[in-house]
């Protein structure tokens, strides 16, 4: 983990204005989006030999409810290429609004939200776009980037949202967007031109949405919402010769599958190693792992990642799971980060807990397991506006602010 370097604590400061989620979203500006797609999205997709398969899409026109997998910075380019020539309104997290500018993101049709909180204004804003702008309305139902190139949990509320919108439900599954730009190795992704493919599938038309129960809509979504980008790479023999392709892999493969030691893994170049037992693996051009000693337990990276999650689940069920650390805290109420100094973070089988000074006042947050379905994690995060280095972090939100927690140890 890296220590945060951004800003001094704001003591005795009045809490800044929070983002107003009640403001109506804007219709995407046609001229602006036309320029952006023509000179950025479409050329890059052409360079990556983009192809999209359309399934059950005959007669399906906007507005529709579009659910897409979330893998990398490539996602929006793929989206616009797949739904060409339409523009869309889309749900975007407040940190992305901050990084790219609130005005610009709203100009492009963005609908701001905070991650993993119940938000009635989001429902109202999505319904407003469907009723007034007649565009596709897009969400990333996983609500975070995939770390291993496979699908994540999708909440059952998605089916209920579809029933409320009363428009067709369409799923976009992209491939190749993760292997060229995994979240633990994002630098120079332009130099990794993996071919990108996608399929756009209508899982329920407007009449079916109104007739089917939310549970059946969720079942249809889950049936289609399946992907594995490392398998896609290996099966299609997509060779990525990037010399630092394994760098950062230890962020997700943090537990040695040979000796079981946690947080002593290291990666650089094309090599992953355990500094406790000395075991080493090579990450091949095709995204596979090969042990230097010839004894490879997990050649497929998602299998190793799944094994780690199963270990954590066993700890939770046994009541022994616990992670605790001192953290540096930054808050993001609207479009600027504010340093809050040091705090304490703990997650165990009882839930997620942290405390800190919050604009000069003592603050605590306690969330039971059923109150927080997931957390958003960033590796080597930077405040793009100030070009300041935050390091590894996670963020947890309440309705009027977001807390970015940077583990110190």
State what each model feature region is.
Residues 66, 346-384:
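Phosphoinositide-dependent membrane-docking surfaces
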Residues 135, 147-215, 219, 240-260, ...:
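A cross-family acyltransferase "interaction/gating" segment
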Residues 61-118, 166:
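Catalytic core of membrane glycerolipid acyltransferases/transacylases, capturing the structured
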Residues 280-360:
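Long, charge-rich boundary regions
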Residues 63-65, 136-140, 170:
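Residue-level preference for the first positions of well-ordered beta-strands
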Residues 373-409:
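Acidic, Ser/Thr- and proline-rich intrinsically disordered linker/docking segments
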Residues 263-266, 283-284:
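Short, non-ligating residues that shape and space the ligands of small metal-coordination modules
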Residues 33-70:
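Helix-to-loop junction immediately C-terminal to a conserved catalytic motif
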């Amino acid at each position: 983990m890296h220590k945060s370097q951004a800003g001094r604590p704001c003591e005795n400061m009045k809490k800044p204005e929070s983002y107003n989620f009640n403001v109506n979203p804007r219709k995407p500006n046609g001229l602006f989006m036309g320029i952006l797609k023509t000179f950025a999205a479409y050329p890059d997709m052409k360079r990556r030999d983009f192809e999209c398969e359309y399934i059950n899409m005959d007669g399906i026109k906007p507005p529709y409810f579009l659910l897409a997998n979330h893998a990398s910075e490539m996602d929006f380019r793929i989206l616009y290429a797949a739904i060409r020539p339409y523009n869309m309104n889309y749900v975007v997290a407040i940190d992305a609004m901050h990084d790219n500018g609130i005005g610009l993101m709203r100009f492009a049709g963005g609908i701001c939200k905070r991650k993993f909180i119940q938000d009635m204004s989001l429902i109202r804003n999505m319904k407003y776009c469907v009723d007034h702008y007649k565009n596709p309305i897009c969400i990333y139902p996983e609500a975070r980037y995939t770390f291993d190139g496979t699908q994540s949990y999708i909440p059952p509320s998605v089916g209920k949202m579809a029933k409320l919108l009363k428009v067709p439900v369409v799923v976009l599954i992209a491939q190749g967007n993760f292997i060229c730009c995994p979240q633990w190795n994002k630098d120079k992704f332009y130099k990794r031109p993996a071919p990108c493919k996608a399929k756009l599938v209508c899982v329920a038309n407007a009449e079916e949405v109104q007739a089917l129960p939310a549970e059946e809509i969720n079942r249809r979504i889950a049936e289609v919402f399946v992907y594995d980008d490392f398998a896609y790479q290996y099966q299609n023999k997509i060779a990525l010769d990037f010399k630092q392709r394994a760098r950062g892999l230890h962020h997700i493969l943090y537990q040695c599958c040979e000796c079981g030691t946690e947080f002593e893994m290291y990666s650089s170049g094309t090599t992953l190693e355990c500094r406790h037992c000395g075991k080493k693996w090579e990450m091949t051009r095709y995204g596979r792992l090969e042990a230097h000693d010839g004894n490879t337990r997990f050649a497929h990276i998602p299998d190793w990642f799944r094994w780690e999650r199963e270990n954590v689940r066993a700890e939770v069920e046994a009541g022994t799971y616990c992670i605790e650390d001192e953290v540096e805290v930054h808050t993001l109420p609207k479009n600027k980060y504010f340093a809050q100094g040091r705090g304490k973070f703990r997650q165990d089988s009882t839930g997620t807990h942290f405390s800190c000074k919050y604009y000069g006042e003592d603050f605590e947050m306690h969330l039971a397991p059923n109150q927080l379905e997931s957390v958003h994690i960033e590796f080597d995060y930077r405040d793009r506006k100030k070009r300041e280095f935050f390091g590894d972090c996670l963020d947890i939100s309440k309705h009027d602010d977001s807390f970015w927690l940077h583990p110190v140890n």
